[in-house]
Amino acid sequence: MNLENLMPPLMFLALVVFLLSGYPVAFSLGAVGIVFGFLGIALDIFPAPLLKAMPDRIFGIMSNQLLLAIPFFTFMGIILEKSGLAEDLLDTMGKLFGPLRGGLALSVVFVGAILAATTGVVAASVMAMGLISLPIMLKYGYNPRFASGVILGSATLAQIIPPSVVLIVLSDQLGVSVGDMYKAALIPSALTVGFYFLYVIYVALFRPKWAPALPPEARPDAGKEAQAAFALLSYLLVGVGAYAVGRFLPAWAEWLEVLLALGIWSLVLLPWIRKNPLLRRALLSMVPPLVLIFLVLGTVLIGLATPTEAGAMGVVGALILAALNRRLSFKVLYGAMEGTAKLTAFVIFILIGSTLFSLVFRGVNGDLWVEGFLTGLPGGEVGFILFVMVLVFLLGCFIDFFEIAFIALPLLAIGAEALNIDKLWFGLLVGVNLQTSFLTPPFGFSLFYLRNVAPKEVKTADIYLGGIPFIGLQLLVLVFVYFLREPILRFVSGMGFGG
């Protein structure tokens, strides 16, 4: 084997050594790229003019309109965390589901899905629900392990439910439409939420001491929950029915018909709304997030806005909501801007480092080496997918999803392209798998977020063990996505709005 063939594996090995040594990822990528670039030039196996393309690549990163969505969604998530949205939803839904065993856990899953569809940021969801719900669940006798697991699992829904930042990054790296990725993610999102609900119901039925119902004294609106729940369910059915009928109308008429149907149904339910304070609070707490979901997600799905434009509208909506709740202050704005700037700088530096590494790696024919290795795996497409899923799962135990997306995904995509695997479906598999990276010990970020806000009586072991069933459920969804490839792709291609 000559030196030219050794360069790609040596580059990869050097990167692994740097990362395991604890050096920052961005600088590790850049250092390996620079060192091996000059080494390749000295050995006459790397064309020096390629390095001249680096400034253009960096300019391309800085001018990428799609990546602007990341700071927008991050800023929106931090503002919403301070706006009182989570508190209102958790309080109202907790009272609504309170009479049921496992009702508080069901409300946490429901609110987790709503927060995921509005913010797309995991940290905000974990900390909000950990601060608000966990003490209440423990107060009324919930098992600490089960309560911690429900909060962890529900918070990670922000990884797969649009407008997830993960899906934006995956779309950018794979070169697929964000709108299509969002549409494809609706199926695993629904499956994940459904499995969470089923798991909570299972625990409530077979381990009732782990998830008791709220006592009557903890429910000021006792006796009104069933009516409020029925009314909210009827809204859902009316909305879905109107949407199904509206599929035969133009896009603008379709959404107008849905809004009109919900408005008429509100008039029908007006006597209930007047007499039932719990129903009023539930509707008032649901309207702001639903408006935000339409601004952020609905406009992307129906093609009215790009993810960047939707993120900008979401920021405006979050600021208005925080102002209406009297939670907007200079301190809140400063904290949101600081957090957004830090994450954006982190992402940009990793992108610059990974671009330099990729430029040199491909310049020494590393892409051919990766393609040969991945396509040579036993089992063909099945063997490749299995290898990638195991690799992503293991990487998720140790490094952040940004690092996986910017370092590993471009290399793995080479094999997917060589095997003619649909990039959208492949990206969706990786996205579902990346959910687990927030829950897997020892470095799952959600575990640390919850540990920081959990009461002292909750042991670290309870937090770690509580997340394991939800890792299993997420992997089960991954299996479903694998076997539902054709239905998912047909759903995306056939998901028109307005016929």
Where are the regions that the model predicts?
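Alpha-helical transmembrane segments of multi-pass membrane transport proteins
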Residues: 1-499
